[in-house]
């Protein structure tokens, strides 16, 4: 299974739906209880292309592109804070009529959005699988060797790095994957951000990371859902990257205390789906089969 091919091509057609003042693009394949895949920065539903096939015979697999990302429309007001994405995503959940037995498969900022939703609508969620997640507010020491980069992104230098150099896509993304992405894969990740002004979401996201109490609103949200998850009996699957990037050290040890949780280790840095999609897919398949039906 480890030697299975990682496909550059994405076999899943995209649909579109109106949400608030824009449109969102999404994958919708399979039938049954919904399994919702949520990506983060600077990726899209393309991240899940090799994983969705493992679940599409077990349920209805949905993977949206967050607003301003992937093939989704932009925010007309250019508002891409966490609370803005949460608002758009809530409208998308309503449009999809996802009100019960939802399994969330979440990564990066998609994890924050997913945990937040699970905390607000616990009766709608059946299970959560998470990887390289934003599980608790961070300290600068948690960033390790990339601390200087993220400090710069949160300073006035961030505009040059992101808007002019497309830094998140060109440097951070490939630098957080063990293997070398193909030209086709890099083209897919670049596609939403070819224009300077289109890169704004990838600049706002690193400035939303809750570090040392800032921004205050995101810090409060992350603290709240972290506490909720630490007390929740919801079935959980923790996918640990080896060596991983953001979910390690004290944060990983804290997550390991969450109840009703199983754990699987896969090779990878931050974008585990690009290094170990088949291992993740197989683990998710087993996890979804094991979750008691409501």
Predicted region positions:
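A short acidic, amphipathic alpha-helical/loop segment
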Residues: 50-51, 250-253, 279
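Histidine-centered active-site/metal-ligand motif
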Residues: 39, 107, 270
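Conserved HGGG/HGGXW glycine-rich cap/lid loop of the alpha/beta-hydrolase fold
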Residues: 27-71
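Flexible "cap/lid" subdomain of the alpha/beta-hydrolase fold that forms the substrate-access gate
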Residues: 2-15, 19, 24-26, 34, ...
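Catalytic histidine-centered segment of alpha/beta-hydrolase-like enzymes
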Residues: 269-281
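A short, glycine- and basic residue-enriched loop/turn
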Residues: 44-45, 112, 269
